[in-house]
């Protein structure tokens, strides 16, 4: 179309996604006396697949959101697939290193996971006795992946505790030197005594990989160079997004009916509530995996997010 028309783009309601899922709820009362115990379970799972992106089938993929890794809708893949740079591997799955001993990057972006969980669920326990009730909610999300941008940046800058190994001899660092004190000559491991006049460093790390010809890597990298490598390889910063949380604890008291009759009230209850109290289990490091999941398209991509917060409150419910 000629540029003279002024037309540049058009928004379309396009694309087809196939979703198949299940949702179930179950409530039981194990104890029903003066003391009552109620338990409510819920479970949900969904499987999606992108069928098409446009009616003319001109598109095979579409970038939904980007950080370093990207969320790309691709025909044949689950919606929410994460794509990014990955380690270069041989036929046996071993990571291949380059001439310096650093991990090599696959020239083609790879599917690194999907941000949608395999399943989610929760258990709500309510314990009641003589007008006092205690509610405890534990919920969980299992499966799915997250790009941890905080980990990527923290590893690159060396501010995380996970970058401590290898930074000095007392932390497992390997001693090495540069022949002639020229870094262009590459690193050489100190075996016994180093040559006279060279500077010896003790922050060496050997990446666990193989050379292009399949031999075990023996090249030493300075710790700083070693840790900086991973920022540019998205696969190194992909984590399992599963978690289990103590989501809510609520302690309630229902005022006796005899106190309410003079006020013509049907019921009054006072509750103390705490939310997001404890991450019981998570597979991410340094962040709450939930911070990367919102209502937008950029789910599964996290970058230097603020910590999640606990909240406490008082509820007053009055029935007239």
What are these regions (language model features)?
Residues 1-14, 48-115, 124, 133-238, ...:
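Surface-exposed, extracytoplasmic segments of Gram-negative outer-membrane nutrient-acquisition systems
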Residues 7-8, 16-22, 43-49, 116-121, ...:
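Transmembrane beta-barrel architecture of outer-membrane proteins
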Residues 11, 21-25, 38-40, 122-124, ...:
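Membrane-embedded beta-strand positions in outer-membrane beta-barrel channels/transporters
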Residues 28-30, 43-49, 129-131, 140-144, ...:
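Transmembrane beta-strands of outer-membrane beta-barrel pores
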Residues 34-35, 131-136, 258-259:
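Repeated loop/turn-to-beta-strand initiation elements of outer-membrane beta-barrel proteins
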Residues 39-45, 127, 136-140, 170, ...:
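Transmembrane beta-barrel strands of outer-membrane/channel proteins
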Residues 41, 113-130, 139, 234-255, ...:
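Outer-membrane beta-barrel transmembrane strands
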Residues 92-94, 195, 199-320:
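Membrane-interface anchoring segments and C-terminal beta-barrel signals
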């Amino acid at each position: 179309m000629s540029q003279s028309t002024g037309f540049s783009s058009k928004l379309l309601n396009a694309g087809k996604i196939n979703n198949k899922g299940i949702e179930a709820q179950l409530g039981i009362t194990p104890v029903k006396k003066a003391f009552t115990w109620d338990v409510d379970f819920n479970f949900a799972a969904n499987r999606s697949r992108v069928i098409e992106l446009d009616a003319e089938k001109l598109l095979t993929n579409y970038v939904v959101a980007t950080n370093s890794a990207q969320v790309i809708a691709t025909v044949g893949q689950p919606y929410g697939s994460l794509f990014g740079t990955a380690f270069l591997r041989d036929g046996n799955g071993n990571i291949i290193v380059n001439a310096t001993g650093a991990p090599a990057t696959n020239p083609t972006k790879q599917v690194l996971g999907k941000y949608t969980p395999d399943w989610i669920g929760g258990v709500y326990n309510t314990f009641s006795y003589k007008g006092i009730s205690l509610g405890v909610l534990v919920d969980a999300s299992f499966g799915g992946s997250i790009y941890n941008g905080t980990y990527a940046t923290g590893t690159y800058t060396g501010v995380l505790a996970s970058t401590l190994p290898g930074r000095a001899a007392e932390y497992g660092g390997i001693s090495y030197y540069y022949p002639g004190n020229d870094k262009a000559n590459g690193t050489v491991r100190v075996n016994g005594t180093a040559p006279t006049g060279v500077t010896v460093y003790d922050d060496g790390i050997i990446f666990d990989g193989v050379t292009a010809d399949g031999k075990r890597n023996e090249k030493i990298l300075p710790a700083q160079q070693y840790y900086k490598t991973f920022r540019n390889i998205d696969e190194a910063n992909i984590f399992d997004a599963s978690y289990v949380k103590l989501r809510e604890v609520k302690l309630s008291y229902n005022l006796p009916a005899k106190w309410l009759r003079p006020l013509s009230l049907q019921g009054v209850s006072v509750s103390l509530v705490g939310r997001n109290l404890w991450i019981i289990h998570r597979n991410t490091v340094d962040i709450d995996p939930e911070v990367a999941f919102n209502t937008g398209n950029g789910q599964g991509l996290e970058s230097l997010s603020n910590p999640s917060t606990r909240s406490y409150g008082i509820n007053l419910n009055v029935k007239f």
